[in-house]
C-alpha cells in the first residue's frame, strides 16, 4: 500500500497565487497578512521582489473565479488561494455571491488541475468576521497551511 500526503517541510519550492477581494478589505487585509505570515514561516519568499508568490486584487468575492482562471493561464502555480469576506446582509445577495464564488472556484480548480483553497469567510456579522481575521484567530494562516499541504500533495502525485 502506498500512502500519499502533503508535506509542510518542502514548502519553499511551491509557486503560490493569491486572488483576494477588496470588498470588506478591513477583513481581507488581515486574512492576507495571516496567510503571508504562514507562507513566510514555512520558507516561501513573500517579499515584493518574490517570484514565488503573486497577489491579484479583485473588487469582490464574485470575481475571484475569473481572476484565478486568468492568473493560471499567465503562469504555472502549484496552488492558488482565493481570499474574501462576505457578511450576510438583509437581502439574498449574500447567498448568490457565496454560491457562485464557491462553484466558480471549484470549477476553475478542476478544469486546471490546480488546487484552489477556498479562503472566503462567510459570516452573519462583522464581529464574526473580525474574530476569524485576527481578534481570536486568523484563518489566513489556516488557508496558507491548506495551500502548502495541497500544493505539495499534488506535486508528489504528479
Swiss-Prot record:
Key words, A-Z: Riboflavin biosynthesis, Transferase
UniProt binding sites for 5-amino-6-(D-ribitylamino)uracil: 23, 61-63, 85-87, 118
GO molecular function ontology, one term from the record: 6,7-dimethyl-8-ribityllumazine synthase activity
Main EC class the enzyme belongs to: transferase
InterPro entries named in the record: LS, LS/RS, LS/RS_sf
CDD domains given in the database record: Lumazine_synthase-I
Enzyme Commission number, as recorded: 2.5.1.78
GO CC term (a single one): cytosol
Transmembrane segments: none
GO biological process: riboflavin biosynthetic process
Residues reported to bind (2S)-2-hydroxy-3-oxobutyl phosphate: 90-91, 132
Domain of life: Bacteria
Active-site residues annotated for this sequence: 93
Catalysed reaction equations from the record: (2S)-2-hydroxy-3-oxobutyl phosphate + 5-amino-6-(D-ribitylamino)uracil = 6,7-dimethyl-8-(1-D-ribityl)lumazine + phosphate + 2 H2O + H(+)
Pfam families from the UniProt entry: DMRL_synthase
Keyword RNA-binding among UniProt keywords: no
Biochemical pathway: Cofactor biosynthesis; riboflavin biosynthesis; riboflavin from 2-hydroxy-3-oxobutyl phosphate and 5-amino-6-(D-ribitylamino)uracil: step 1/2
Family: Belongs to the DMRL synthase family.
Function per UniProt: Catalyzes the formation of 6,7-dimethyl-8-ribityllumazine by condensation of 5-amino-6-(D-ribitylamino)uracil with 3,4-dihydroxy-2-butanone 4-phosphate. This is the penultimate step in the biosynthesis of riboflavin.
PANTHER family on file: 6,7-DIMETHYL-8-RIBITYLLUMAZINE SYNTHASE (PTHR21058:SF0), 6,7-DIMETHYL-8-RIBITYLLUMAZINE SYNTHASE DMRL SYNTHASE LUMAZINE SYNTHASE (PTHR21058)
The name this protein goes by in its record: 6,7-dimethyl-8-ribityllumazine synthase
Organism: Prochlorococcus marinus (strain MIT 9215)
Amino acid at each position: 500500500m502506498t500512502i500519499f500526503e502533503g508535506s509542510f517541510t518542502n514548502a519553499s519550492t511551491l509557486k503560490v497565487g493569491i486572488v483576494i477581494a477588496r470588498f470588506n478589505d478591513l477583513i481581507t487585509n488581515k486574512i492576507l497578512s495571516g496567510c503571508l505570515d504562514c507562507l513566510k514561516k514555512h520558507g516561501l519568499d513573500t517579499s515584493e521582489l518574490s517570484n514565488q508568490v503573486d497577489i491579484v486584487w479583485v473588487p469582490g468575492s464574485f470575481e475571484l473565479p475569473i481572476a484565478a482562471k486568468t492568473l493560471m493561464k499567465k503562469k504555472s502555480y502549484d496552488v492558488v488561494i482565493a481570499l474574501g469576506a462576505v457578511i450576510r446582509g438583509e437581502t439574498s445577495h449574500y447567498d448568490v455571491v457565496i454560491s457562485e464564488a464557491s462553484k466558480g472556484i471549484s470549477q476553475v480548480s478542476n478544469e486546471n488541475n490546480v488546487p484552489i483553497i477556498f479562503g472566503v469567510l462567510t459570516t452573519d456579522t462583522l464581529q464574526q468576521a473580525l474574530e476569524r481575521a485576527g481578534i481570536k484567530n486568523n484563518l489566513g494562516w489556516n488557508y496558507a497551511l491548506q495551500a502548502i499541504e495541497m500544493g505539495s500533495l499534488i506535486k508528489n502525485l504528479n
